Regions:
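Short conserved catalytic/interaction loops centered on acidic-Pro-aromatic/His motifs
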Residues: 81-90, 147-158, 173
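Intrinsic disorder/low-complexity detector
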Residues: 1-33, 82-128
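Charged, amphipathic alpha-helical oligomerization/scaffolding segments
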Residues: 14, 41, 70, 100-103, ...
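Hydrophobic alpha-helical segments, chiefly the membrane-spanning helices
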Residues: 180-184
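Short, compact, well-ordered microdomains
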Residues: 62, 66-69, 160-161, 166
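Hydrophobic, ordered structural segments
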Residues: 63-84
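Short, contiguous, well-structured surface segments enriched in hydrophobic/aromatic residues
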Residues: 16-60, 64, 123-154, 158
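Conserved small/polar residues in nucleotide/adenosyl-binding loops
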Residues: 167-174
């Protein structure tokens, strides 16, 4: 389990590093996005991953790695947007955005480590393509919950699905780690 934690921390640092760089380039321009738009951005990235897996090639010089990082970072953005609501302007500082990023990533990590313990790292035996299918399933669920104005009868809400997308996306499993860049 210690190796798993170190591997997850490495992947998380890659995602955060890119988030920081894009935050410096673009500011918190994503603050104008409504949660439904964030969900659609994640959907686009997951569909591209499935397309690359199915076709076995990509015509754009960005592979699966960048899409997985995007899913993680948009998942965090989604959690921030659910917490703060969307805005008509970039209404938070870089520091505040990073504080919120770290807060939601920490909450997600704690849940991920608990689930990893309970499931005894069963995810390490999963096929890579199953991750993509799980991500797409979570997105479909999220869209349905959004279409129902966030109301569910027995299921968790949009926030729980965003969190699940975060720990389903880039895993340190052999083969999956190679999908992540060694540097951002």
């Amino acid at each position: 389990m210690a190796d798993t934690i170190a591997q997850f921390e490495h992947v998380i640092s890659i995602c955060r590093d890119l988030f920081v760089k894009k935050l410096k380039d673009y500011g918190a321009s994503w603050r104008i996005m409504r949660p439904q738009s964030v969900t659609d951005q994640i959907f686009i990235k997951a569909k591209r991953i499935r397309s690359i897996e199915t076709k076995g090639e990509s015509k754009i010089d960005e592979g699966v790695r960048s899409e997985l990082i995007g899913i993680v970072n948009y998942g965090i953005i989604g959690l921030i947007q659910l917490h703060l609501g969307y805005s008509d302007s970039e209404d938070i500082t870089v520091e505040r955005a990073l504080d919120l990023y770290d807060k939601y990533m920490t909450e997600t990590k704690e849940l991920m480590y608990a689930k990893n313990h309970d499931y005894d790292e069963a995810w390490r035996s999963m096929r890579i393509s199953s991750y993509t299918d799980l991500i797409l399933t979570k997105i479909c669920r999220t869209k349905q919950i959004e279409n129902n104005n966030g109301k569910t009868l027995v299921s968790e809400g949009v926030d729980a699905n965003y969190i699940c997308l975060l720990y389903t996306s880039p895993s340190p499993r052999d083969g999956a780690t190679s999908r992540m860049p060694s540097s951002a």
